[in-house]
Amino acid sequence: MTPLDKGLDKARVLIEALPYIQKFAGKTVVIKYGGHAMLEQDLKEKVMLDILLLHSVGIRPVVVHGGGPEINSMLTRVGKESHFVRGLRVTDKETMEIASMVLVGKLNTEIISLLNRFGGRAVGLSGKDAQLLQAVKKPMQFQNSQGELEDVDLGFVGEIEQIRPEIVTSLVEQGYIPVISPVAGGEDGESYNINADTAAGEIAKALKADKFLLLTDVPGVLRDVEDKDSLLSVIKEDEISGLIDLGVISGGMIPKVECARAALQGGVGSVHILDGRIPHAILLELFTDGGIGTMFNA
C-alpha cells in the first residue's frame, strides 16, 4: 500500500465518522469503564484517548468506573477472603474501607491522571461528593434448600435511593470530564459499595444521557455463545424479555441487559454493550456504520 493509499484510507475513516460526530455533538455519553480494559496499560490508554476524542469533537463524556478485580487483589494482599452472594460482594466494615481506598484513592486517581496527561480536563468524584449518590443498605433474600426465603446480610452494599446530578452537570457544562467511583453515602453517615453498572445506569438516567456505553469482556449479546459471528447488533426494548425466555440472554449478561432496559425506561436514548478488549472500542461503536457491539433502543 502506497503512502497515498494509506492517506486515502484515513480520509475515508474520517468521512464515515463525520455524520456521527455531527449527530452526537453536544450530547451526553455515559461510559461504564470496567473489565479487562482497566487492567492492560495499552488498552487503558486507548480508552482514555477515545474519551478525549469524544470530548474534543463536542461530545460530553461522563465516566463511571468499576474495580472488582483490583479490590479482590488488595483483599488478597491483606489476607482477607472475598465472599459473594448472587454476584454481590459481602462487604463488612474493613472490606468497605479497602474498597473505598481502591476505588476512590487508587483507580479514580489513576484514570484522571491518565486523561489529564493526554491533554484532558478530568475531575475525579465519588458518589459521596456533593451527595451525588445517596444509598440505603441493600436488602436481599435467597431461597434455601428447603425452598424457604432467608434474609442475607450483605453488609455495606447499597442500592441507590436518591441521585443529585447537579455537580456532574455543572462540571460537564464547564468543559470538564467527570470520572465517578461507585461509592455512595447513606443518611446514617456510612459509605456503601454500589454495583458499578447500576451506578452508571442511574447516572445516565439522571443526566438523560443520549447514550450509555457498558465496556465488558464479551462482544455483546450473541445468538449463539459458541459462535462469535452471531452478534445481535440491535435489540429493541420489547424484545428483551423474549430473548431471556429463549436463553439467548443468560447468565451474567442478564443483569447487564436489565440495566440497559432500566436506562431506556428512564429516558436514555440508547444503550450499548461492547467489548472493551478491542482497541478503540468506543470509537468503533459510535463512529462507524456497523458498530462492534449490541445496541439497545426503544
UniProtKB/Swiss-Prot annotation:
Give any Pfam family that matches.
Answer: AA_kinase
Domain of life of the native organism: Bacteria
GO MF, one annotated term: acetylglutamate kinase activity
Question: Mind telling me which InterPro entries this protein's record contains?
Answer: AceGlu_kinase-like_sf, AcgluKinase_fam, ArgB, Asp/Glu/Uridylate_kinase, Glu/AcGlu_kinase, NAGK-C
At what residues does the UniProt record annotate the site feature described as Transition state stabilizer?
A: K32, K256
Annotated GO CC locations:
cytoplasm
E.C. number: 2.7.2.8
Q: List the Gene3D superfamilies.
A: Acetylglutamate kinase-like (3.40.1160.10)
Q: In which pathway does it act?
A: Amino-acid biosynthesis; L-arginine biosynthesis; N(2)-acetyl-L-ornithine from L-glutamate: step 2/4
Provide the residue positions that the database annotates as binding substrate: G67, G68, R89, N193
**Cellular compartments annotated:** Cytoplasm
Catalytic activity reported: N-acetyl-L-glutamate + ATP = N-acetyl-L-glutamyl 5-phosphate + ADP
Q: Which UniProt keywords apply?
A: Amino-acid biosynthesis, Arginine biosynthesis, ATP-binding, Cytoplasm, Kinase, Nucleotide-binding, Transferase
- Could you tell me what this protein does? Catalyzes the ATP-dependent phosphorylation of N-acetyl-L-glutamate.
Sequence similarity = Belongs to the acetylglutamate kinase family. ArgB subfamily.
The protein depicted here goes by the name Acetylglutamate kinase
* Organism (species): Desulfitobacterium hafniense (strain DSM 10664 / DCB-2)
